[in-house]
Amino acid sequence: MTNSGADQAGTQPSRLQWGGRFAAGPASVMQAINASIGFDQRLWREDIEGSLAHAGMLAAMGIISAEDEAAIRAGLAEIAEAIAEGSFTFDPALEDIHTNIEAWLVARIGEAGRRLHTARSRNDQVATDFRLWVRNAIDSLDGQVRELMRALADRAAEHAATIMPGFTHLQTAQPVTLGHHLLAYVEMLSRDRGRLADARRRLNECPLGAAALAGTTFPIDRSMTAAALGFDRPTANSLDSVSDRDFALEFLSALSILAMHLSRFAEEIIIWTSAPYRFIRLSDAYTTGSSIMPQKRNPDAAELARAKAGRIFGALTGLLAVMKGLPLAYAKDMQEDKEPVFDAADAAELCLAAMTGMVRDMMPDVLRMRSVAGADFSTATDLADYLVRDLGLPFRTAHHVTGRIVSEAESRGLELVALPLSVMQEVEPRITEAVYDVLTIEASVAARRTLGGTAPDNVARAAARWQETLA
């Protein structure tokens, strides 16, 4: 537990960037609540990248010497190597990643290191670092979403004609194909990629040079640093530059919708693997057992993917709550922006990997799915369509007639395809033997040839298009 004694001395003010006007250092509890190095050390690559771009611009504008720039570059390269190999010691007393790196730099190269922060504040520095990190995370996650889409498209092509029940209200509705069902998730994930791309496009402006909130008196070239860091342009307003966390919120929003899609699919995997359904079997690689029941094979990977969606939703609502009452410009509340973003990105990365593995690994029970697809009068809509198309009944009348025929079949314990013609004709005398041509599940799926329908040829073409797009 943290000692809350206010009289316990913490870091000496001389060690802190802002210590000049303070006679005493912060209390230990203040130091503990103020430090972010425990989590923002993940920004070390981006912090060094931003500092290299800033130093290059300062030298190009004659604000620091070429010799100082060279020393800064060498020192930052040494720091990067030390962090990468694990020999760099992060000091909580130095609060954050920015101060830790700068303190190490000054200790190694002296006065040149003190010049690096010219025309820069930690406010625009962290905003830049964080945008770079989120941009990298988007690129990485986009690649993972693409891999999951490829796995789904491959399995959809394999099962373009595999018939399964389609559900509404989790009740058997109409026959579809497994390939059609899997491609529905490909479409969802495609929109997720679009949202991530939109978020990336909007975040790709560089706040570096906004300084604390009002800009700087030095003749800097913000376009130069923006270009060096791969941004499209500098941000337009210095106050907005350091106050904005829309990019993080939009990222979390996109991840939340993605996580919702993954959670829905995970729920279906859980249902499909359950004993009453038995549509698919997951391999041992993605299931676990019970400590007491030897027979159990639990779909824990899917259950955890479903659960982690809640963490991602919580990250979004948590950061919205942090930001909702903050006046411009920067407030220390904004230090709480990173952990939810890091946690959500980590959870999404793990869920995508698990879902991709399960999709590639799952073993559908084709015969079981086909058997269930033919039950519960799943071709009743086809009967109603027949009455409209072949007998000229208005659809509402056909719907009513079909309902009566379903009741007759149900009372006899028969599916529609097995119901005698004479029984159907008692309800609608004009029905002929041709009705049986539309009542099989094969006929049902084959007849749905309209754009986006479940006909196997449609599904095969759609799967092939996605495979080509994602290749």
Curated annotation (Swiss-Prot):
Protein EC: 4.3.2.1
Pathway noted in the entry: Amino-acid biosynthesis; L-arginine biosynthesis; L-arginine from L-ornithine and carbamoyl phosphate: step 3/3
Entry's Gene Ontology BP terms: arginine biosynthetic process via ornithine; L-arginine biosynthetic process
An MF annotation (GO) of this entry: argininosuccinate lyase activity
InterPro entries: Arg_succ_lyase_C, Argininosuccinate_lyase, Fumarase/histidase_N, Fumarate_lyase_CS, Fumarate_lyase_fam, Fumarate_lyase_N, L-Aspartase-like
Record carries keyword Heme: no
Origin: domain of life: Bacteria
GO cellular component terms listed in the entry, alphabetical order: cytosol
Compartment list: Cytoplasm
Keyword annotations: Amino-acid biosynthesis, Arginine biosynthesis, Cytoplasm, Lyase
Record-stated family: Belongs to the lyase 1 family. Argininosuccinate lyase subfamily.
PANTHER family registered for this protein in UniProt: ARGININOSUCCINATE LYASE
Name of the featured protein: Argininosuccinate lyase
Provenance organism: Acidiphilium cryptum (strain JF-5)
